Amino acid sequence: MLNDETAKPFVSLLAFDKEEAIGHILFTRVYFSDKEVSPMMHILAPLAVKPIYQRRGIGGMLIKEGLHLLQAMGSEVVFVLGHKEYYPRYGFATHAAHLGYLPPYPMPKESEVYWMVQPIGPTGYEVGKGNVKCCDELNRPEHWRNEESDR
């Protein structure tokens, strides 16, 4: 995704323990597919921490620092498709579609809770609403489906 022009500007952060990389987070650009002009918005994907370093707050530190850097860049809104109990601890609201932010691909109703949003700019939720489109690399159906949704 780092070579995908539609992902820019992006934020990529690594967490280290001495010289060993133990965690990574990436935020890439997203757009409203149904609008000619979109505010600067991003999606968090992926976040990974090596298993032996999990449950130590490393993922949370990466999220907080990433959101801080995005806010400084002028990003207005950040999305994530993830764990419904983890990401709300860092300010994400579940059911982003109910707030007017539709995911890139349709989701089963029971999965809508995992599509989340967090306004980080001064306009908050007034930034606009619409169908979210990810950078080209992430905007593939296989990234937005699971086995159950295919049945």
Which residues make up each language-model segment?
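Conserved beta-strand segments that form the floor/walls of ligand-binding pockets within enzyme
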Residues: 14, 26, 43, 48, ...
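A conserved beta-turn-beta hairpin within the catalytic core of GNAT-like acetyltransferases
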Residues: 31-44, 54
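Active-site rim helix/loop that mediates acceptor-substrate recognition in acyltransferases
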Residues: 1-31
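Short acidic (Asp/Glu) patches
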Residues: 27-28, 62-66, 96-102
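Conserved active-site alpha-helix within GNAT-family acetyltransferase domains
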Residues: 72-76, 82-109
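C-terminal "cap" of GNAT-fold acetyltransferases
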Residues: 103-150
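Short loop segments at secondary-structure junctions
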Residues: 18-19, 52, 119-124
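Conserved acetyl-CoA-binding loop-helix of GNAT-fold acetyltransferases
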Residues: 44, 49, 55-68, 79-80
